[in-house]
Amino acid sequence: MGFFSLMQELAIDLGTANTLIIYNGKVVVDEPSIIALELQSGKVKAIGTEAKKMDGRVHPNIKTIRPLKDGVIADFKATELMLRGLIKKVRTTSSMFSPSLRMVICIPSGSTNVEIRAVRDSAEHAGARDVYMIFEPMAAALGAGLDVEAPEGNMVIDIGGGTSEIACISLGGIVCSESINVAGDVFTTDIQNYVRQQHNIRIGERTAEEIKHAIGAAISDLDEEPEDFVLTGPNMLTALPQTVTLSYNEIAYALEKSLVKLDAALMTVLETMPPELYADIVKNGIYLAGGGALIKGLDKRLSNKSGLPVHIAEDPLRAVARGTSIAMKNVDKFSFLMHDN
């Protein structure tokens, strides 16, 4: 982009758990999708990482809000404020003029027209002049390096914070797909519930996420076993500190009921897929993206379930953001981008 360009282009992965912003092919913002507000004044106290540090530690006059739930906007005003604040963190120009903003934002493939409108309105209120949107499975496929416009089938499973999206893509379109509200946030809750029920220890979301990242597993026979996780928390009966050691096998057990739903959604898409595209998937395999792709052994589990090869996309946490950035560079080429003139 030239020095005198009046259009600033941002690719945004507006996720339930994290929001990523890419400018000039680089991730310039990667922060939790959370905002802290002062209740009486409505003033923004913190956004992103700083707000996440406050979560669970605030007094009654400050509230932390996660504006997105299950991949869609749950709080319009908070989303607008969060987006505006995160965009301000993008130091992209030294010009004395404020450039117009063009955004490409990824959204769940099951989004309703009302939900799509809410994303567009939030972007426009945050300063966007021109807004394009791309469905998350398409962005994940682009970010995984797949040719989404080729006359052959490609399959992606994008496991984010609020939703898991499973889609078969061919010729620039989503042929068949499933979107379920079983993803990272549900896995975190599963771990909280397990620790409470099995060990009588109450843990917060942040601790459960630490456990998930350290020993989260989809199968109980990993080739490389992670070290056990030592946890100290308040016993629910005595309120005294209690220490337990958690193994990855326990977490695999804790996640099992949710993972069975993911298995079923995958099989539903495979069963509804045209035979010609199925043959392509047998050859090309399935690509995993999103934070959930980092659950240990998930690729092996899904491969065993489907009988198909399963690959983890490079840097799966940023695959959707990468794909959104690729879409930004090709807004005039990709006919599958949604845009209101």
Language-model region placement:
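Nucleotide/phosphate-binding catalytic cleft detector across ATP-hydrolyzing
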Residues: 1-159, 167-286, 293-341
